[in-house]
Amino acid sequence: MADEAKKIIVTGASGGIGRAIAVEAAKAGYYVICHYNHGKEKAEETLSLITTSGGEGELVQFNVADRADCKAKLDSLTEKHGALWGVVSNAGITRDNTFVGLTGEDWDAVIRTNLDSFFNVIQPLVMPMARKKKGRIIAVSSVSGIMGNRGQTNYSASKAGIIGAAKALAVELASRHITVNTIAPGVIETDMTAAINEEAKKIIMQTIPMARAGKPEEVASLAVFLLSESASYITRQVIAVDGGIH
C-alpha cells in the first residue's frame, strides 16, 4: 500500500482530533505520518490503531514551535517520501485565563504553538507540493477563533490568525491546484475539554443548539473528505463542526 497510497502528515496525532484524523485517513487509504512532540507512547498508540486496522504510517517527532526543528525534520521527510499529498496542521495548546490574568509566557506559548506552527510546519512542505501541482492543506482552527471566547484571548487570537493565514495561502496556491481549508471545531470530546469542570460543562452545553459535545471522529470525517479528490474545488473555506454554536 505504501508505494501507492497518498502520503499525508498530521501534527498533534497523539490524541484527540489529531488521532481521529490520522486513524480515519489511514482507513481511507492514506499513508499517515503521525507527528508528536512529547507524547511518544500516545503517538505509538495512534500508529497501532492505524496498523491493526490495515493501514500504514510512521511516527515523526519535532516541536511545532521550533522553526529550525520543523524544517530539519520536514526536509528529511520530503527527501524520504517526496512531495506529500496532504498536510493537516492540528497541533495546539491552551493556557486559559482572563486577559488581565495572562502572563507574557501564557500568551507567547499559545501563539508559538498554535499560530507560528502554521508557518513552521506548512512552509517547508509547500514547495515540493507546488512543483507537483497538487495537494491538500488543512488547518485546524476553532470556533474560538471565529467568535472569541471569554478567558481565551490568547487562544482566540491564535486560532483567528490561522483562519486569516489559511485564506491568504489558499489564494496563493490555487493556481497550483493545492486547496487550503480550515476546520473550526466547537466543543469536542478530547483531553482538552475533559479538564473542564462539570458546572462549566453544563453552562457550555446550554449554548450548543445540539446540546452535546462533538466527537473527534465527526471532525475527522470532514478532514478526510477535504483530503480527497472529491474536494478539489473547495478551497479558502472555514467549516465549523460545532453543533450550531455560532
Q: How should each PLM-predicted stretch be described?
A:
Residues K134, I178, R212-V241:
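C-terminal substrate-recognition "lid" of short-chain dehydrogenase/reductases
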Residues S142:
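Residue(s) in the substrate-gating loop at a strand-loop-helix junction
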Residues M127, V171-S175, S232:
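Alpha-helical segment proximal to the catalytic Tyr-Lys
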Residues Y30-E44:
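Conserved glycine-rich Rossmann-like NAD(P)H-binding loop of the short-chain dehydrogenase/reductase
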Residues S14-G15:
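Conserved glycine-rich cofactor-binding loop
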Residues T98-F99, D106-I111, I204:
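Substrate-binding pocket helix/loop in short-chain dehydrogenase/reductase
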